[in-house]
A protein has these predicted regions:
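Charge-rich, well-structured scaffold segments of protease-associated domains
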Residues: 2-36, 55, 110-267, 276-277, ...
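Short, structured beta-strand/loop micro-motifs enriched in basic residues and often containing a Trp
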Residues: 43-44
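Short, small/polar residue-rich loop motifs at catalytic or cofactor-binding pockets
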Residues: 47-50
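N-terminal signal-anchor transmembrane helix
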Residues: 52-54, 62
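Active/ligand-binding-proximal structured segments within catalytic/core domains
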Residues: 59, 66-117, 298-310, 318-322
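Active-site glycine/GP-rich loop and adjacent strand/helix microenvironment
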Residues: 273
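Functionally critical, cavity-lining and gating residues within the transmembrane helices
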Residues: 315
Length: 472
């Protein structure tokens, strides 16, 4: 069966069993609606108190974190490939391939895969983002070898026996997504910010590509991208590092490549743009955003604090002013995204037509305020405790630990201990946050996107944010 992932920014997941594994690429509107913390995929630095890393001759990197106090294991097989690595003729192949990993291998049928995982009491899932694909599971520590064998077989041995039926499933997922403007508007914003660059494409891809792409093209993409240098095996829980390394040697045998095949061009951004899609919706779904920082930028800790203050928590300025004081929205908040060589800062609000001018007026006022003045002492202190609390609570989940160490090694980000991470957050200064607010929350640098019934009213509502957007 298939279900949407929770995501703050589209990382698309296919649900196969119980959805209690940490979603490696969280979501835009779900987190914005709950206004929990940093938008996933955003600046969530990696925590690793006892992580060990080993690189195999095949180029695969194995990273583990032992948590002896638990009786479970979270295992993830990460691949450094996603929608950014596709050509327009391949739009959506990464996500389509992720679905097909569950649909049969040389040794197991789709039904057998489901039955084996059920028999192990495992929760299994997968997710695709713009720069990564992840196949992951949680299971009892007594089933580590069986789960490892099956996951690795799925990752590297798909035979595509059910491609026609799964093609229809993905087309239905795309159709479902078209009916979810609160999610789709973030893809509209990405196109406005990144233009024709691959980061501007949506992870789900295009229906015309999915309906026609042949098996040989999918298999060629799989063979080109699912290579040793692109794969990370990550495990957290009641495990032994050497045992996971040995299982990786025995079960994960991808083609060997000299490099991970990265040939990305950084996006050349053209300044603030406006993108609108007409749809007869009850609300105006509006997203604003502009260039951010890349994932290796040391300013990511300060940006996490800034995001928490501006719209990433229930005490944030946007949540307080738009929702709590005025009741103008149910879902409102901010988020950040970091990629290999670029990033995005964004915000979202969903509001009825009668409220759109007032809501955008408040957003424009808050943008101008934080851009000019930064944040105050109370906000800085509260945001630090908020972010640290989330990090500590998250570190108690083996699935979250696996996700963090896996992403860190996949993207060559230093592994930090929890204490080191907390020190990074504590060290953030007013000046750092103010500089980021000045650089990235300048109203004139933000693009605007909307899915709504009335373009003229949307554009006129943008005047308090940036008058130039009204006629852009």
């Amino acid at each position: 069966m298939s279900a949407p992932a929770t995501r703050v920014r589209p990382a698309v997941a296919v649900m196969v069993a119980v959805a209690d594994a940490a979603d490696p690429g969280a979501s835009a509107t779900a987190a914005v609606a709950a206004v929990s913390a940093t938008a996933a995929g955003a600046a969530e630095p990696e925590v690793a108190d006892h992580a060990q890393v080993t690189e195999l001759d095949s180029g695969i990197r194995v990273v583990t974190e032992a948590v002896p106090s638990v009786r479970s294991v979270a295992l993830g097989l990460w691949v450094r490939t996603g929608s950014r690595d596709e050509t327009p003729a391949q739009a959506g192949v990464s996500h389509f391939l992720e679905h097909l990993l569950f649909k049969g291998t040389k040794r197991y049928s789709a039904i057998e895969i489901a039955e084996i995982f059920d028999g192990l009491g495992a929760a299994v899932n997968a997710a695709t983002g713009k720069e990564s694909t992840n196949l992951y599971a949680r299971f009892l520590d007594t089933h580590t070898e069986e789960a490892f064998d099956l996951l690795s077989e799925m990752l590297l041995g798909p035979t595509y026996p059910e491609i026609d039926s799964e093609r229809e499933v993905v087309l239905e997922e795309i159709a479902m997504y078209e009916d979810e403007p609160q999610d789709k508007v973030h893809d509209v914003l990405d196109r406005a910010v990144f233009g024709g660059h691959p980061l501007g494409r949506r992870v789900l891809g295009e229906a015309d590509v999915i309906s026609s792409i042949p098996v040989p093209d999918i298999d060629a993409y799989h063979r080109a991208r699912y290579t040793g240098a692109n794969i990370v095996v990550a495990a957290a829980g009641n495990i032994d590092h050497d045992a996971i390394v040995e299982l990786s040697r025995r079960h994960v045998e991808p083609p060997v490549a000299d490099s991970n095949g990265e040939s990305h061009d950084a996006p050349d951004l053209d300044g603030a743009q406006v993108a609108f899609q007409q749809k007869d919706t009850e609300q105006f779904h509006i997203a604003l955003g502009g260039p951010g920082i890349d994932r290796a930028d040391e300013r990511r800790y300060a940006l996490t604090i800034l995001d928490a203050v501006f719209g990433g928590s229930t005490s944030s300025r946007l949540f307080r002013e738009v929702r709590e004081k005025k009741g103008l929205a149910y879902a409102v908040g901010s988020y950040t995204q970091q990629y290999a060589d670029s990033g995005l800062v964004g915000l979202y609000v969903g509001t009825r037509e009668d409220n759109v001018e007032e809501a955008c007026g408040i957003i424009g006022r808050e943008l101008a305020s934080i851009h000019a003045d930064g944040i105050n002492d109370d906000e800085l202190a509260r945001a630090k405790e908020h972010v640290k609390g989330r990090m500590v609570l998250s570190s108690e989940s083996t699935a979250a630990r696996m996700g963090r160490i896996g992403k860190a090694v996949l993207f060559d980000i230093p592994l930090l201990t929890l204490d080191e991470l907390l020190e990074k957050i504590d060290a953030v200064t007013h000046e750092e946050v103010a500089e980021l607010a000045h650089d990235f929350y300048a109203p004139e640098s933000l693009s605007a996107a909307a899915i709504a019934p009335n373009e003229e009213r949307f554009r006129s509502a943008l005047a308090p944010v940036n008058e130039a957007l009204v006629a852009a």
